[in-house]
Amino acid sequence: MTSSDVIPASTTSSSGWIASVGSAAGWVWDGMKVTGSVFNDYGTSTTRNTVCTTATVAGGFLGGWSGGAIGSAVGTLILPGIGTAVGSFLGGASAALVAGKATIVVTDRVLDTISYDIETVSCEKCGRGFRCKLYKEGRDKLCYRCK
């Protein structure tokens, strides 16, 4: 390492730490969501909540990353400099929200189709069969009509 490899302190960005703190806060929040899902699943002896939350976090991350890249490119074309920053923020935030919501819908449909953590059981009161969503309700013994 030579002296030319070292960046003087006066040329470093003062807003760099804000971005670092924001990124860390996002990762902590996502980690808390996944951890909460693990605890919920542990209580009901299922894994579906963890699978859905992990897929949603991954979808939101990938959507935000790609939306930020596209937004910054469009912003640079419109107004280099400030347009890059604004486009990156708007593209990343909006794409992360849309991708996260889309991931929830797709994941639920796929897992419902394969009956992941869903059992068909007979109601103890009326004898009708019903689909028991173990990951939501636990092991219900009564159908929705008899509750």
From Swiss-Prot:
Q: Please give the name of this protein.
A: Uncharacterized protein ZK688.7
